[in-house]
Curated annotation (Swiss-Prot):
The gene is miaA. PANTHER family: TRNA DIMETHYLALLYLTRANSFERASE (PTHR11088:SF60). It comes from Roseobacter denitrificans (strain ATCC 33942 / OCh 114). This is tRNA dimethylallyltransferase. Keywords: ATP-binding, Magnesium, Nucleotide-binding, Transferase, tRNA processing. GO terms for biological process: tRNA modification.
Amino acid sequence: MPEKPVLIAGPTASGKSALALRIAAEQGGVIVNADASQGYDCWRVLTARPAPDEERQTPHALYGHLNAKVRYSAGHWLRDVMPYLAGEARPIIVGGTGLYFTALTRGLADIPPTPAEIRAKGDRLERAEMLAALDARTRDRIDNANRARVQRAWEVQMATGRGLAAWQDETGAPALPLSAAQAIVFDVDKEVLNARIEKRFDLMLAAGALEEARRVLPDYDPTLPAHRAIGAPELIAHLKGQISLEAAREAAITATRQYAKRQRTWFRSKMRHWSAYMP
């Protein structure tokens, strides 16, 4: 019987993947992705997906398995992760998408699919417009700065006539109760994390992130979640001649730090019962 699954959550650039690799090397297991951006095949460098040699050393799953045009929700991820929970290899589930972990350990509401015409309308709206249309309970529950989360909540409300919070309150049993897992959440000092973010983005540029963005440029669509990966809009703007590379670098680092701040707030609010890990 495999040991309890390991869950590793934390903000971007905190060192989650390194810990997952170490656990897998010492104890075995399969590393399963729980980061929305790392699921897309158009990015490896920019989203800090595991390197090819790391993937050869240890089994990895749900990395780069999605075409950029695919709309992928927490429900899709939960469906895809289920075989690894039932498999013989111990799953080491690692990532920074808090909603995935919440769906896994607290359950997911059975919300009807969103009609294509409603999604298309949402793609054309500004985040603030959609946010203003949400009920107060839903606004209080989601990350108001995350466009994907705001649009998802707006789509649910438009399609069903009910707020996302109301649907979530009817959530069924979780696939993996927290008591059945070894749950670790990274708690990294803000200044340390900010320095790591800057250093990592410079390493990404050196490793080919700009070339990655150049390959995406002909098909770039800012309405696609895949193309809203942190750093992508900034590098695309540079490639279009709108800003300098240095300005793109600074904007991407700022955006990453803002994202990390939102992640840390989420984790501290939603993962109080997880074991804190301070690298």
